[in-house]
């Protein structure tokens, strides 16, 4: 798979990201929107937001080459928990065109929130996945009276 950066920008957290990251509305955030493809076939669009201060010189990093998680590691941010929320939606306009889909086509939507051991949110990503590439497996286990659900996207 390869990655094409569609846009990057620095912005204020605003209401949405201040609630997700538990920071004031005017906190600086960095946003990366990437198109993921395999063999020149669009797979997904990822809209990732991180705290601007979390990665040194973040504007200068080529995220088509370097992994966000490598940059976290270099900047001593250790991800402890990754939460995925799967839902369905439809895609329109530019996103539909980039994914090679018709207007209003269904997609699988995944919200990803990565946190450190201290519970600090390091990343929020919204992913729109072409259904042909959105197969996932879930498994539920009851252990000591507690239900645990795991899932895997493949």
Residue ranges of model-derived segments:
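C-terminal all-alpha effector/ligand-binding and dimerization domain
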Residues: 2-154
């Amino acid at each position: 798979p390869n990655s094409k950066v569609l846009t990057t920008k620095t912005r204020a957290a605003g209401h949405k990201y201040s609630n997700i990251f538990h920071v004031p509305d005017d906190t600086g955030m960095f946003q990366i929107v990437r198109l993921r493809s395999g063999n020149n076939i669009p797979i997904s669009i990822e809209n990732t937001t991180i705290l601007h201060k979390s990665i040194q010189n973040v504007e200068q990093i080529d995220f088509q080459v370097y992994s966000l998680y490598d940059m976290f590691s270099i900047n001593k941010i250790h991800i402890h928990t990754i939460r995925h929320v799967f839902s369905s939606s439809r895609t329109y306009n530019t996103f539909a065109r980039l994914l090679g889909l018709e207007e209003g086509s269904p997609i699988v939507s995944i919200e990803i929130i990565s946190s450190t051991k201290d519970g600090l949110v390091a990343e929020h990503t919204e992913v729109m996945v072409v259904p042909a590439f959105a197969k996932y497996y879930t498994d539920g286990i009851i252990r000591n009276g507690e239900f645990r659900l795991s899932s895997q996207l493949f």
